Design a protein with these regions (language model features):
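Condensing-enzyme catalytic core mediating Claisen C-C bond formation in acyl metabolism
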Residues: 1-69, 73, 77, 159, ...
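Claisen-condensing/thiolase-fold acyl-transfer catalytic domains that form or cleave C-C bonds
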Residues: 72, 76-79, 83, 94-172
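Short, surface-exposed connector motifs at secondary-structure boundaries
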Residues: 87-92
Length: 172
């Protein structure tokens, strides 16, 4: 196989203050707590066949109280990490869009971050927990509903199985 030499060089991208775009992303995981939230009957080892259905292995297993505590702590920490990386504070957030898993988690994070109701976007009551689609759905709804305007600072914050959590700071 003949591979042509690299003929182009990489160039740095510059995002000027005020330009729309992703300011930063922050992602973490801790497999040491995987048993708190997982789905045992997935993949090649436990495919969805009658046996795994009968043994209820296709359903999510969650230790709710422990997940609540970990989710609130992790989502708060990663939100503060994103803000610190950009020399911002919670008062700079125009809209906080968290993973729409549980109203108690959202309220607890909002309180710990000192956010007011106008800074929170919650659509959980309309759609329920839509899993990994919750933030994109909420972002689209907030945009279409006029809750986001050009130049706004958005903080997206999520937590999920495995355990994983992350935040993205965006200038709209």
């Amino acid at each position: 196989m003949v591979v042509p030499p690299v003929t182009r060089t990489a160039r740095p991208a510059e995002v000027r203050a005020g330009d729309p775009g992703i300011l930063s992303t922050h992602i973490h995981s801790d497999g040491g707590h995987w048993e708190l939230l997982y789905q045992p009957g997935v993949g090649n080892r436990n495919p969805a066949v009658q046996k795994t259905l009968d043994e209820r292995l296709v359903y999510i297993s969650m230790q709710g109280n422990e997940i609540f505590k970990l989710a609130v702590r992790a989502m708060e920490e990663v939100a503060l990490e994103a803000l610190a990386a950009n020399n911002l504070s919670t008062s700079d957030i125009d809209l906080f869009i968290p993973h729409q898993a549980n109203r108690r988690i959202i309220d607890a994070i909002g309180k710990r971050l000192g956010l007011d109701e106008e800074q929170l976007f919650i659509n959980l009551e309309r759609y329920g927990n839509t899993s990994s689609a919750s933030i994109p759905i909420a972002l689209d709804e907030a945009n279409r509903g006029g809750r986001i305007t050009a130049g706004d600072i958005l903080l997206l914050d999520a937590f999920g199985g495995g355990l994983t959590w992350g935040a993205a700071l965006i200038r709209w």
